[in-house]
């Protein structure tokens, strides 16, 4: 035996599991690229002046079993008290059939945002269900497919109200004082950058004010009172003031829809529909509005359209509103939202149906009525006369009540002066109610629950008659057909089969980093130690979370070369916003609040200018040279021109053109010379980890897409996490929180509802870093770079590689130019993308950052076998284009312009110039394993001209 025990223990096993190719395959690819080793590859590609001598130290790797055991020990430090805190968060029950077949299913959680609708019909249908749930319960005309959280949705409502307001000189936004404090916090943060004045007061006080463009009301107040705002909203309409209403989705099952009372915008959280609290997230927010405001809505909207054969098909509608097209003029910077969580909420509604949901809501309300009656019998006073699930109980002995609750391992709401709050939920039982009566009142409960039940059932007025829902909801068959577990399981499986996710094939989307989301990384997100924690529980109960987040923050700080991390932002775009706010606040602290110019290269991702606009900055575009690099001369000229007002530059590294720009250090130096800060977008961090760091390069702040580089799955369009790393001078200016005190940052406004954003998915990134260790992380980056260069090398004779670095290499992604093919043969990047579906692949990123191109990012997780299959598909497509050029196939009837091809086409009359086999089995690989798209190419023009964003009749599904 020549192996040592250390070798046999194989602590770096996970590296081999995560990196797709074997050492032998890596060597073969290196040979094709003409390089002897991974280290030589990075030495040749990465500029010398930014290369690290050794990778950042995050420790050695660990096996899956070791990492899971270590994290489990940390998780057990969380104290699992029963939380009745409320404030927009409540325990819920995730039906096991949805847990197993959706949340834990890579066919659902590894998919990408459905930009390619032909391979996304399953989750698009589920998101349409989510929109239907939202439309029905809010009483509005149109709904989006989720936003990041309720507080963000409220801030978006304010921004939207200003966009659609006819009161152009009004700059005041009114918020009713019975709003969740975290919602108000995020609204104030957004208002500050827009220059809006936020006024908080009793709702009726708005009628005494001038210059108000919008109002935010909360139907069920944060302290529990149900508000009938119909008269107020009617009066506001006469004054042309836009009214937004924050609503509780579970309460809406019983309460009158705000839309029926005249609301213009309705928003809230769908967390109560089967999604765990998770210490604050991730949760899907819902957002709905009147039809007249549809063009001003933020976020993705799923619409019903048709495909090339005239059949019903779904797509993302009205994308011209969004940041990837409108940039700084976009309605919002929203990119990643909360699709996976929206799908869970939608399936929760599908599984329970309207009657099941009504039963749950009525049970919650009945138990709240019983609790109220029991407390009154025991001598307690309630602050309000109306409620759905939340009571505010007056007490002269608050300390005593809270001590009894603590002894019983119960959390009540503590921040109400002279009172405690208690919010019941789906998991509350009659036994829980008895305990609460005794704990809050300090007296034994001498009555009988059934007696109280009979009393309140016959006499309750806690929901006013005028506020009771009377209309039928969820009448579509989708909410009535799948109430048995068998039918539900099959429904989710049918939808899954329509989609292409990482469990089927590689997803080579440039700038998206669709890498492995390992099963071991995913396991902890369903542990009750993580899922059951309320975000506003006392800190001593969340020691496990705090330890895990602190360790992850320290690792990320080392990996990025920054001094501090802020883990609050819920997405990359929100991280951009938070980082730019830190820069803005830093300048203001130095008496330089006039610095508002943000320089952004023309190649930047659309979120950059959209985020800069949201942060109150003015975007000035910097040109790129013919090689795709930032034009240093143009940058310097504009930095000098705007030096008195220069706030920052936003750059991506490697660039969005897939190149390590040689002048990145010079870019940083120029900006600093003129008093600005450097924001380095972390979208391409997968080509930096272990090789260089943003801090070492010279930047001041970056966000990280944990759902790219650090293995949180994309979920079909969310969840994501976008924490920011900052240099020490910016650390005091990162987001704080109004509810939970955070070390060192208590004065700055929040950007997310919860202090750590979507905290319950952070264990995924913790597991990834812990298992890979320093060397594994560096190797992952190197192999990602190798894979991209291998693809470029093999394709270069058939496709033009648009950009490369000084040595002729690309970074972790490459761009192939389809424009010459379009000019010469009439075949577009769209045709190539759709034809790849017939070969079993999701298309690369289309027309970004350059129109008429495809950007390919293979990541380190794909094997050489899969990469070769993808390359062979592109080479075969190039040969098919030659067939068009040679006249074998007409330019208007060939397998590219007609792609993709569906199974149903095969049994129809075939009049094409090419065979059925050529259409659907274009390679040997497809004969062994075939993905069938559910629809043909979408008719985008029809979809936008005939906007329909709710469920169609069931006959259309069959």
From Swiss-Prot:
Record-level GO BP terms: glycine decarboxylation via glycine cleavage system
Catalytic activity: N(6)-[(R)-lipoyl]-L-lysyl-[glycine-cleavage complex H protein] + glycine + H(+) = N(6)-[(R)-S(8)-aminomethyldihydrolipoyl]-L-lysyl-[glycine-cleavage complex H protein] + CO2
E.C. designation(s): 1.4.4.2
SUPFAM superfamilies: PLP-dependent transferases
Cofactor dependency: pyridoxal 5'-phosphate
Modified residues annotated as N6-(pyridoxal phosphate)lysine in this record: 708
Keyword Oxidoreductase included in the entry's annotation: yes
Record's function text: The glycine cleavage system catalyzes the degradation of glycine. The P protein binds the alpha-amino group of glycine through its pyridoxal phosphate cofactor; CO(2) is released and the remaining methylamine moiety is then transferred to the lipoamide cofactor of the H protein.
Family the entry assigns: Belongs to the GcvP family.
Name this polypeptide is given: Glycine dehydrogenase (decarboxylating)
Organism of this sequence: Proteus mirabilis (strain HI4320)
